[in-house]
Amino acid sequence: SGGFAMRPDIRNNERVVIDAPALAADLYARVARAVPPTLADPRAVGANERFRCYRYRPGQHFARHYDGYFERDSGERSLLTLMVYLNEGFEGGSTVFHDLGVVVTPRAGHALLFQHHLLHEGATVHSGTKYALRSDVMYSAR
């Protein structure tokens, strides 16, 4: 993925990147009511078609981090992370926002929206396998 190198001290999960514009449109239609229509100046225009598919096996995690943004050639830029939890049947693997004191327990089919600048982590999976799909909400160029 274009010079991207995972640091095992930060994350040791597995990841596949796919581009799926039709899936992005369908996903956005399902979550649009929960998306802030504007953040400062720009307005929401849809979901990012670049999906990151994550698999976490026992012992795998994603340490505290901020999510990076995605920018299109048009100047549209992601401001929100859109995480969809794909399964249950594992222990651990919560999404933790330490500064906010919030712990999100993954539930199959549920989505989590949050601003990229919020420090968070994917806690260690203790048993079973966790699957999640990450996209972003794209906003118009400023």
Give the role of each language-model region:
Residues 1-111, 117-142:
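Fe(II)/2-oxoglutarate oxygenase catalytic core
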